[in-house]
């Protein structure tokens, strides 16, 4: 499926607006946007089946691949249906929300929206926590299963690999059958998989199951942003998205802290998996009251109900236009790889995010090297050294609403037309903090020096990490508005590859080069990457003009 150039950029979308905008099933939704009231909106592809005679831009419900905008699925009419003159199907009508429709997630109470937001954000933390919690007691894994540390490290890496593969199936599946059922089924499987992890008789069993834990446990990381977009209007969701953005990094940071104390207290790494199972099960119970939030699925259910009860021919565009299996595979697998090979913006931003994510997972193995091997601390005390990273995460969490407010002010001043490079402010602020933390860690990690230096190096790193991630996701969504799900899928694959790879060689790197020079080298790599957001801020418009997928 060739990439189609578009000049649509009137989006006010923020991060995760949806993380599946160009998912195959998402492409087939009736885009419920009144184009008469939004004249800047254009369609990049006219449907051959739903609109055989072309699309009149004076009518709503045109099939478009424009910017991700939740309002597209929020058109309200007095009767809850709209007869689109572009459909030559007699009396068939398209279903909409009714005025002030109580089933429309945007009309739910703020208290209920915040419950959904907090539950989804905590599920992200819980899922990410599960990937790194075993890092707190890998020494016991090596001893009990009689393997070397490099093999034991795979129990962390393979779950992160699963994080990169699982979304390729989970994302399109959620668009077809709804987010809730995918959440409930996959997380229950994830909970059950903790049992063979805890009872694993050998390392092969543990590693295989940990990979599948990543494939099924990635659901919150994949869907939570979309759920938040489902229930909040664009201008309301800044703080909600900030909570979500912290989760993928707060969770892994908490893992070694908790896992270390479990290992110290029990002397058995298997208890880590029992505790993780209990933790996710408690979170699973909080998810049960949350209903389906994805508007296209809710409207499809409504159309089916109306047809069954009244015989009235009411449909959604999703029902009228289905993609072939080949198209589904093409969008979800081929396009992310195509973008990675052809889009310099995506390559650079994804590579930067992968570096940060890899460094975070590198810390999980660097801290034991410094504090256990170098200073003689136990795993529990070493876990406490991750607290400054969490302090930095909280600092970034406090900053993101101000960035959103600044962005919205620029948007209003520009008559609602966005410039993607406005999103780069947060990345420009964040990028110097990352090498700062690494260099502090490098030259304070001598065994003879007090613990404060290497421990508190995590604060600037944690701050820059989350602030960069938040802004980078926003930027990719704004740049690749028509293909943002593919862009984000590509970013996730690269990020997961980085996070999975670093634990496999970081110990060798520190032992071979010394801790100081190893992290000095990594710090210099991060310094070399600082110009990336500044370059795109200055020249991003020119780079986008040469792109086949980015908006101009």
Swiss-Prot record:
Region feature Disordered, mapped onto this chain:
1-59
Query: Which intervals carry biased composition (Polar residues)?
Result: 39-50
Localization: Membrane
Q: Which GO cellular component terms, listed alphabetically, does the Swiss-Prot or TrEMBL entry include?
A: fungal-type vacuole membrane; plasma membrane
Residue stretches spanning the membrane: 116-136, 158-178, 181-201, 203-223, 238-258, 271-291, 345-365, 383-403, 424-444, 450-470, 484-506, 519-539
Q: Could you tell me which PANTHER family the record lists for this protein? A: MAJOR FACILITATOR SUPERFAMILY, POLYAMINE TRANSPORTER 2-RELATED
Family designation: Belongs to the major facilitator superfamily.
The name on file for this protein is Uncharacterized MFS-type transporter SPBC409.08
């Amino acid at each position: 499926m060739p990439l189609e150039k578009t000049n649509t950029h009137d989006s006010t979308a923020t991060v995760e607006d949806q993380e599946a905008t160009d998912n195959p099933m998402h492409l087939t939704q009736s885009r419920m946007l009144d184009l008469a009231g939004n004249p800047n909106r254009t369609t990049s592809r006219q449907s051959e089946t739903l609109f055989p005679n072309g699309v009149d831009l004076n009518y709503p419900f045109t099939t478009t691949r424009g910017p991700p905008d939740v309002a597209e699925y929020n058109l309200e009419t007095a009767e809850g249906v709209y007869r689109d003159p572009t459909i030559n199907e007699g009396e068939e009508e398209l279903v909409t929300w009714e005025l002030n429709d109580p089933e429309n997630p945007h009309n739910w109470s703020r208290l209920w929206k915040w419950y959904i937001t907090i539950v989804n954000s905590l599920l992200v933390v819980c899922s990410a926590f599960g990937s790194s919690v075993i890092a707190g007691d890998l020494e016991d894994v090596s001893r009990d299963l009689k393997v070397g540390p490099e093999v034991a490290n795979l129990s962390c890496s393979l779950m992160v690999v699963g994080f990169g593969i699982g979304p390729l199936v989970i994302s399109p599946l959620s668009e077809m059958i709804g987010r809730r059922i995918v959440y409930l089924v996959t997380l229950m499987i994830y909970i059950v998989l903790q049992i063979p992890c805890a009872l694993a008789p050998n390392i092969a069993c543990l590693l295989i199951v940990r990979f599948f834990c990543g494939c099924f446990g990635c659901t919150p990381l994949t869907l939570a942003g979309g759920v938040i977009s489902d229930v909040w209007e664009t201008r309301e969701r800044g703080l909600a998205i900030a909570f979500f953005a912290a989760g993928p990094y707060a969770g892994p940071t908490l893992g070694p802290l908790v896992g270390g104390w479990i290992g110290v207290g029990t002397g058995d790494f298997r208890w880590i998996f029992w505790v993780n199972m209990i933790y996710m099960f408690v979170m699973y119970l909080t998810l049960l009251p949350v209903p389906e939030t994805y508007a296209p699925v809710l409207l499809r259910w409504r159309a089916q109900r109306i047809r069954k009860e009244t015989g009235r021919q009411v449909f959604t565009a999703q029902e009228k236009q289905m993609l072939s299996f080949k198209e589904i595979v093409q969008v979800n697998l081929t396009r992310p790889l195509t973008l990675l090979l052809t889009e310099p913006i995506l390559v650079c931003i994804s590579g930067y995010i992968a570096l940060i994510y890899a460094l975070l997972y590198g810390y999980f193995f660097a801290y034991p090297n410094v504090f256990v091997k170098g200073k003689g601390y136990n795993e529990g005390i070493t876990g406490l050294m991750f607290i400054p990273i969490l302090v930095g995460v909280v600092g970034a969490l406090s900053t993101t609403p101000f960035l959103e407010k600044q962005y919205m002010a620029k948007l209003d001043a520009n008559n609602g037309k966005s410039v993607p490079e406005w999103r780069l402010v947060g990345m420009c602020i964040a990028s110097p903090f990352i090498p700062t933390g690494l260099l502090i860690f490098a030259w304070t990690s001598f065994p003879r020096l007090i613990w404060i230096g290497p421990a508190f190096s995590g604060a600037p790193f944690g701050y820059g990490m989350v602030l960069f991630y938040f802004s980078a996701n926003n930027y990719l969504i704004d740049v690749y508005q028509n293909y943002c799900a593919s862009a984000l899928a590509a970013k996730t694959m690269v990020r997961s590859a980085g996070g999975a790879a670093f634990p496999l060689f970081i110990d060798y790197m520190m032992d071979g080069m010394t801790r100081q020079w190893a992290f000095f080298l990594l710090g210099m790599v991060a310094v070399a990457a600082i110009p990336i957001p500044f370059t795109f801020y200055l020249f991003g418009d020119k780079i986008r003009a040469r792109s086949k997928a980015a908006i101009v």
